[in-house]
């Protein structure tokens, strides 16, 4: 029976014959068909429904077949089949609701509702898709759904068993879902609730047996009460009347009393919740504001007249007024003329935010202020030197936060926080105190925890000035009061996450407290001590451990004496000091009762008495190196926060909404039960959040069924219609199972238009101004276009001109939203072709789909119009005269338009060249000049030149003769020559001389035929001289290889102009113009020597000059004789001079091997830099730089040992054993090579005894503190030249030589930390020294009995070296230092030596979190992030990492990629995150959901970038 597979090949066309549809019913009724083939057919059918329109004649058969499957197969036996058929049914309902809603007749709707609500397993994974399907039917026929649900509640049943009560419960839950859908879609959900309240009353009065089981009845009553209480708030007068009326209508007294008791318990529960919080928030906030008291301001600034508010009816008018009011802020510079205007405009802005728009339409208002850049422009006023203007701007931002609070996205809150933070350090105390006050009110006003604001507040503790650090202590206190776990659980009933964001940031809080309590300023210390006890109140275990282990006894005592009395903390003081009374005043400041909570003075103004041990102390800068290890759960960095912090979730930005969805999905998935179909279910109901809706990640189903992967996606894709996350508390409370996470309802299509009646649509479309309205209008337009495509020709046509102006505006603003429209024929026929071309380009539409209808021989005008439109677009882009409103749009997509249309034209001409269709070619041939000339004109713009020249070549092949004529007539010679060059590469028969001639290349004066022959020659001579001068200045001859053109022959003297390359102008030596060309001539360092054109009188005897080696002093003494050179203690490089001109190091004959002229020279031998002896340094070398040993040798030693780099003797390349332990091309090898002296055979200069004596002297000199660079060289040379030498080995191991050298090396590294700047030479040599010691350590380990494979001894020896190098890097101002490169190479060697382990990553993360110094260049942080990347690349270290470790790395890197403008941090952290993703993908238990959870701290676009980087590693 496998033949049915052939019946499904042609099912994408909506007009296909019924016989071509999926034979679902036939196959599933046939018992002989194996279940695997049935599931394969059903899988393909599901993919078809998700991606394409269905055959309308088969819709009823499809519904019958899918309902048959659920009734014929048991879920226990076929769980995969039942779930697959259910999801297919739900997608089919969504498809039919969109494509052909008339199919939903009354009988079918009732059957579907009965099946979706009652006949499926009582599991959430089925409930989720069922609600989505019911929603689709409800949007088509809401009244029918309401009537059926009400009828389900009306049906009496004499036998009220458990099944009956379950039916009622399922019906009630469905009603709740519908009300919730109406509420989310901004419909009148209360009206729908009132409709069903009548059914609730009838159910309780008539259909619920009062004598039945009380537990079952109570479940129904509680569910009804929860539904009503959920939408009818008890504090609303009208809602209270509805509740009272409902209770009065109940006839069964038992049920009435139950309802009344539920209402009372709900009120009591609410009041108990308010009283059970850890802190009295109102009182605590008063104390915080007293700490950050607003300075005494004038009445105009501090007070706000409630009557002064401005209301708007139109959002466009609001935006226009905002732009006008912000005009004075456009100028960066504040002038005498504009500052008063700025202040008055801020007051007007304050009136606007007090009006109706921010309250009634907060999301749209936020969008407007983003577009007009309100925050950026107001920030210019906050930094004004005029105090009144600055304070006015600050208070305006404060009121803006208070009015919008959680409606403001994190990006705007971040901007405002930074504005306030910058003013904390202001020299004007009134500005600083006002900014302090505004920062505290910012945290008080927001209701959601934002990790970015938490991190910014934490960084304030590192500021240099006192006020930011004091503010940081108060901000931490506000976070603890506002976002502690008790507040989180009480204010968010849906929250079940085991940890809060604040709890996951405990490591930051602890470091925060340690820095504040040990601060040098008393005000900061005292404020942080009070904050500590708020931390103790929230997390007593962590606070006790911190107090006992992280503070000195003095600081601990001072902290214990600062316990606020009003917190009622039960803490036993370790030992009460006799001076406790001295600090009691501080405690009394926080012991006021709530009746006397308003204090007249702030803590900043109190005169404080403190004991001697609490005097200002210096904060420790080294305690952070020993940060405690993190827990296995990875709670050091914040990982997740439940999306149910408040019922009024902020969804004003795509980022925040996606974050909420991801958190909800993670939260629900924590409770999932793993079963046999978990993998399939996840694939069906979930998609990767970072993937776009049309990605393959969203359409993938079970790995066993991938037969429909090749389905086309050019129609409306329903893949994501059933996969958006949501959470309903009633489902969690009343559903029996929690198998899979729930999902939120998609944005519905609002309204319904009858066919042919488009006036309402036109008005709704043109009036749409808010983003939500525009999105709804587009969805409705899409639906109407799909419906009208099936109408008869007599039906009214949709008039695109009625909405074209608005449609164009939306295209400019959101062109990607039109991708699904490009496959709708009605849309492509109604929209102008030039708009379509732009949409095709931006959405990367398939070229074949465009040309399928455009290259029809019967309609050649279609192709002609397409080419003309593209040419006009090129002209428009080249002219660059677009309207101001569209400039940004064309600037953004200009390159995209060019590249896409190049490829589109390439396909057109390629097809024309292959098919040779005369009809199409004739129409195109007339357009060839136009398209060719515009292509010539746009050369030089920003686009893909490979595609450009491929298109040029195809047009050239289309009609090469005509193309050559067009190109020859083109004016710009440079463009012409480049095109000719590319065509010459592609076509061997192409001749450049046919295109470029003298007349077309150089502009000459026209020849007068009346002139005499002598005049003509004179004119030619002038022209030729001009050309000659032009070529001499540039040294380039553009007319090479053009000997055939007689007009280019120079008539002066051909012999005077010769060139070895035909493109460089060469003068005769006697020519007076030679000096100009010699000065401007450019000679490559790899160019072969040319014969020396020296004159005879300037000749010098080469051999005689080679015999003498002149010193600089001998030249000054005019002595030509050789003198005996003396070797000083500190030798300097000697330079040998010669009378010959400088020569290139490599001789011509050396560059060509075996006489083969075509053989390419070795680039290594051609390099002018030679680290080792070079074989090519022959007698022609005239400049030699010598490096000699800094060793005091005897004259005999010098004569016998020293190496001379002389011209008459070739030196051998040295190779030492230790060199094999360094990378070949490393900077370490380069530096080492300059320390060595070898003779011509490469042997070492001295024996071990000589080296050892020098090394011993150097150790003593360095320890005494008086040494030079040569003494450091003495330490390094024996380690290199005597590597694996037995005497050296014995001394290092048996005589404690290794430890002695290591101590000296650490001493040298520490000496670099004593100065503000880095001594580069000492630092470089010190790193080379420890690098050599590391190589020796690895060698010595191999000689021991127990080889150190795990790097234990290496870590013990080089731990302090690593710390000193990090301290050194902290002083760097840039990355262009050789010390940084040497440190990188040393770090890589440590990596290979197993120095780094899993705990090393934890310490690095701790340093990155706690030791960030904003006033440095961040070189150290970049180095540490690079180290993490290296560790993640090491397989041995990666095996030690757990997911919690990877999560910590991801959370920390999220700050460095998003929370800073340092590009080096951004790049290196992005690479680390990409590597983390690769590591997670290689784990055995890898799942996309888990990865999304780990990366949910990143915005969607950043995560996409990380995925791209990871895929290209």
Swiss-Prot record:
Keywords: Cell cycle, Cell division, Centromere, Chromosome, Cytoplasm, Cytoskeleton, Kinetochore, Microtubule, Mitosis, Nucleus, Phosphoprotein. Residues 586-605, 648-701, 1089-1180 are annotated as: Disordered. The keyword Nucleus applies. Residues 586-603 have a biased composition (Low complexity). GO terms for biological process: astral microtubule depolymerization; attachment of spindle microtubules to kinetochore; cell division; mitotic spindle assembly. Residues 461-716 are annotated as: Interaction with microtubules. Transmembrane segments: none annotated. GO terms for molecular function: beta-tubulin binding; kinetochore binding; microtubule binding. The modification Phosphothreonine is found at residue 1047. It is found in: Nucleus; Cytoplasm, Cytoskeleton, Spindle; Cytoplasm, Cytoskeleton; Chromosome, Centromere, Kinetochore. Coiled coil: none annotated. Residues 670-684, 692-701, 1103-1121 have a biased composition (Polar residues). It comes from the Eukaryota. The keyword Phosphoprotein applies. The modification Phosphoserine is found at residues 997, 1018, 1063, 1167. InterPro entries: ARM-like (IPR011989), ARM-type_fold (IPR016024), CLASP_N_dom (IPR024395). Microtubule binding protein that promotes the stabilization of dynamic microtubules. Required for separation of the spindle poles during mitotic spindle formation. May cross-link overlapping antiparallel microtubules in the spindle midzone. Present with 521 molecules/cell in log phase SD medium. PANTHER family: CLASP, CLIP-ASSOCIATING PROTEIN. Self-associates. Interacts with microtubules via the TUB2 subunit. Belongs to the CLASP family. This is Protein STU1. It comes from Saccharomyces cerevisiae (strain ATCC 204508 / S288c) (Baker's yeast). The lineage of its organism: Eukaryota, Fungi, Dikarya, Ascomycota, Saccharomycotina. The gene is STU1.
């Amino acid at each position: 029976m496998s033949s049915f597979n052939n019946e499904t090949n042609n099912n994408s066309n909506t007009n296909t014959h019924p016989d071509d549809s999926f034979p679902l019913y036939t196959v599933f009724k046939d018992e002989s068909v194996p279940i695997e083939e049935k599931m394969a057919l059903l899988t393909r059918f599901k993919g078809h429904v998700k991606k394409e329109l269905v055959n309308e004649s088969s819709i009823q058969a499809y519904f019958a077949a899918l309902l048959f499957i659920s009734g014929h197969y048991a879920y226990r036996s076929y769980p995969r089949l039942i779930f697959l058929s259910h999801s297919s049914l739900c997608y089919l309902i969504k498809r039919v609701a969109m494509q052909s809603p008339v199919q939903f007749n009354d009988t079918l709707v009732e059957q579907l509702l009965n099946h979706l609500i009652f006949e499926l397993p009582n599991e959430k994974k089925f409930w989720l898709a069922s609600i989505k399907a019911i929603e689709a039917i409800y949007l088509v026929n809401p009244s029918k759904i309401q009537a059926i649900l009400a009828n389900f509640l009306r049906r009496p049943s004499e036998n009220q068993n458990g099944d009956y009560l379950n039916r009622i419960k399922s019906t009630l839950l469905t009603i709740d879902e519908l009300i919730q859908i109406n509420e989310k879609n901004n419909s009148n959900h209360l009206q729908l609730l009132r409709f069903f309240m009548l059914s609730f009353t009838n159910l309780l009065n008539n259909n619920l047996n009062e004598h039945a089981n009380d537990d079952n009845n109570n479940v129904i009553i509680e569910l009804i009460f929860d539904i009503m209480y959920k939408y009818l708030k008890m504090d609303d007068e009208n809602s209270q009347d509805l509740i009272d009326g409902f209770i009065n209508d109940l006839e069964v007294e038992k049920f009435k009393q139950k309802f009344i008791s539920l209402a009372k318990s709900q009120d009591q529960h609410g009041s108990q919740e308010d009283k059970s919080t850890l802190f009295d928030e109102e009182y605590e906030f008063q104390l915080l504001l007293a700490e950050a008291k607003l300075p005494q301001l004038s009445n105009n600034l501090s007070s706000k007249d409630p009557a002064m508010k401005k209301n708007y009816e139109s959002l466009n008018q609001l935006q226009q007024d905002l732009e006008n009011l912000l005009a004075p802020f456009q100028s960066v510079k504040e002038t005498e003329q504009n500052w008063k205007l700025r202040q008055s405009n801020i007051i007007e802005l304050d009136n606007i935010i007090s009006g109706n728009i921010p309250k009634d339409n907060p999301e749209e208002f936020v969008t407007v202020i983003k577009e007009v850049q309100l925050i950026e422009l107001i920030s210019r006023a906050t930094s004004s030197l005029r105090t009144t203007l600055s304070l006015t701007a600050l208070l305006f931002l404060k009121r803006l936060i208070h009015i919008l609070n959680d409606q403001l996205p994190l990006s705007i809150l971040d901007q405002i926080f930074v504005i306030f933070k910058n003013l904390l350090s202001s020299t004007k105390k009134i500005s600083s105190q006002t900014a302090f006050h505004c920062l505290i009110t910012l945290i008080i006003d927001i209701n959601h925890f934002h990790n970015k604001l938490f991190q910014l507040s934490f960084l304030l503790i590192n500021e240099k000035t006192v006020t930011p650090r004091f503010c940081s202590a108060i901000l931490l206190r506000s976070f603890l009061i506002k976002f502690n776990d008790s507040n989180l659980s009480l204010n968010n009933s849906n929250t079940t996450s085991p940890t809060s964001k604040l709890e996951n940031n405990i490591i930051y809080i602890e470091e925060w407290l340690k820095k504040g309590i040990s601060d040098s300023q008393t005000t900061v210390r005292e404020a942080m001590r009070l904050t500590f006890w708020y931390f103790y109140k929230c997390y007593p275990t962590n606070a006790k451990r911190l107090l006992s282990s992280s503070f000195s006894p003095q600081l601990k005592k001072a902290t214990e004496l600062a316990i606020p009395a009003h917190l009622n903390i039960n803490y036993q003081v370790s030992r009460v000091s006799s001076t406790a009374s001295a600090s009691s005043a501080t405690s009394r400041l926080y012991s006021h009762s709530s009746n006397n909570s308003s204090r007249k003075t702030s803590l900043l103004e109190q005169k404080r008495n403190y004991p001697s041990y609490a005097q200002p102390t210096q904060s420790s800068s080294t305690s952070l190196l020993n940060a405690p290890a993190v827990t296995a759960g990875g709670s050091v960095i914040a990982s997740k926060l439940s999306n149910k912090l408040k019922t009024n979730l902020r969804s004003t930005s795509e980022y925040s909404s996606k974050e909420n969805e991801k958190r909800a999905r993670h939260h629900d998935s924590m409770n999932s039960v793993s079963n046999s179909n978990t993998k399939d279910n996840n694939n069906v109901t979930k998609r990767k959040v970072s993937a776009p809706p049309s990605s393959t990640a969203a359409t993938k189903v079970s790995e066993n069924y991938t037969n429909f992967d090749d389905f086309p996606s050019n129609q409306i894709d329903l893949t994501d219609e059933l996969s958006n996350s949501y959470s309903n508390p009633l489902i969690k409370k009343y559903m029996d199972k929690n198998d899979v996470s729930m999902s939120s309802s998609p944005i519905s299509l609002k309204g319904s238009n009858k066919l042919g009646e488009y006036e309402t649509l036109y008005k709704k479309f043109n009036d749409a101004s808010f983003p939500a309205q525009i999105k709804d209008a587009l969805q409705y337009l899409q639906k109407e276009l799909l419906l009208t495509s099936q109408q008869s020709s007599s039906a009214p046509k949709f008039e695109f001109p009625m909405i074209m102006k608005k449609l164009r505006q939306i295209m400019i603003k959101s062109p990607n939203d039109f991708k699904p429209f490009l496959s709708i024929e009605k849309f492509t026929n109604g929209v102008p072709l030039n708009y379509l071309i732009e949409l095709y380009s931006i959405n990367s539409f398939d070229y074949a789909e465009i040309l399928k209808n455009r290259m029809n021989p019967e309609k050649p005008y279609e192709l002609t119009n397409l080419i003309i439109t593209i040419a006009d677009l090129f002209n428009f882009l080249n002219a660059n005269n677009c309207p101001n409103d569209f400039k940004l749009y064309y600037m953004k997509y200009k390159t995209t338009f060019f590249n896409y249309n190049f490829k589109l034209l390439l396909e057109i001409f390629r097809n024309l060249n292959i098919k040779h269709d005369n009809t199409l070619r004739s129409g195109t041939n007339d357009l060839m000049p136009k398209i060719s000339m515009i292509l010539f004109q746009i050369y030089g713009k920003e686009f893909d030149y490979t595609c450009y020249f491929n298109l040029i070549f195809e047009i050239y092949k289309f009609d090469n003769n005509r193309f050559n004529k067009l190109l020859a007539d083109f004016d710009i010679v440079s463009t012409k020559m480049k095109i000719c060059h590319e065509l010459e590469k592609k076509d061997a028969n192409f001749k450049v001389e046919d295109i470029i001639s003298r007349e077309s290349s150089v502009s000459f004066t026209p020849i007068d035929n009346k002139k005499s022959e002598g005049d003509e020659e004179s004119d030619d001579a002038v022209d030729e001289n001009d050309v000659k001068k032009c070529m001499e200045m540039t040294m380039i001859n553009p007319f090479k290889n053009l000997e055939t053109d007689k007009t280019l022959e120079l008539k002066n003297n051909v012999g005077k102009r010769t060139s070895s390359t035909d493109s460089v102008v060469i003068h005769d030596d006697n020519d007076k113009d030679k000096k100009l060309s010699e000065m401007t001539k450019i000679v490559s360092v790899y160019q072969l020597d040319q014969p020396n054109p020296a004159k005879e009188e300037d000749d010098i005897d080469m051999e005689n000059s080679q015999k003498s080696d002149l010193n600089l002093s001998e030249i000054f003494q005019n002595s030509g004789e050789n003198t005996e050179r003396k070797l000083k203690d500190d030798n300097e490089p000697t330079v040998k001079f010669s009378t010959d001109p400088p020569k290139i190091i490599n001789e011509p004959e050396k560059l060509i091997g075996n006489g083969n002229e075509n053989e390419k020279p070795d680039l290594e031998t051609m390099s002018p830099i030679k680290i080792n002896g070079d074989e090519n340094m022959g007698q022609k070398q005239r400049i030699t730089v010598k490096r000699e040993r800094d060793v005091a040798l005897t004259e005999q030693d010098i004569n016998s040992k020293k190496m001379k780099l002389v011209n008459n003797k070739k030196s051998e390349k040295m190779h030492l054993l230790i060199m094999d332990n360094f990378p070949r091309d490393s900077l370490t090898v380069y530096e080492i090579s300059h320390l060595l002296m070898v003779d011509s055979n490469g042997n070492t200069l001295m024996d071990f005894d000589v080296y050892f004596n020098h090394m011993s002297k150097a150790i003593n000199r360095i320890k005494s503190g008086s040494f030079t660079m040569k003494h450091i060289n003495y330490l390094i040379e024996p380690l290199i030249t005597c590597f694996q030498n037995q005497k050296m080995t014995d001394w290092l191991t048996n005589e404690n030589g290794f430890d002695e050298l290591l101590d000296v090396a650490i001493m040298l590294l520490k000496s670099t930390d004593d100065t503000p700047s880095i001594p580069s030479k000492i630092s470089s040599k010190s790193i080379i020294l420890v690098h050599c010691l590391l190589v020796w350590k690895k060698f010595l380990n191999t000689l021991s009995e127990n080889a150190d494979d795990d790097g234990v001894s290496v870590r013990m020896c080089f731990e302090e070296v690593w710390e000193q190098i990090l301290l050194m890097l902290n002083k760097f101002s840039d990355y262009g230092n050789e010390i940084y490169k040497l440190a990188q190479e040393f770090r890589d060697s440590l990596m290979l030596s197993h120095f780094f382990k899993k705990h090393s990553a934890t310490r690095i993360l701790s340093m990155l979190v706690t030791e960030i110094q904003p006033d440095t260049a961040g070189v150290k942080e970049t180095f540490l992030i690079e180290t993490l990347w290296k560790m993640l690349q090491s397989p041995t270290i990666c095996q030690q990492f757990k997911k919690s470790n990877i999560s910590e790395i991801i959370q920390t890197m999220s700050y460095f990629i998003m929370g800073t403008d340092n590009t080096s941090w951004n790049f290196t952290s992005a690479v680390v995150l990409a590597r983390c993703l690769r590591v997670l993908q290689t784990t055995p238990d890898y799942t996309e959901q888990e990865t999304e959870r780990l990366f949910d701290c990143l915005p969607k676009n950043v995560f996409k970038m990380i995925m791209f980087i990871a895929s290209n590693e």
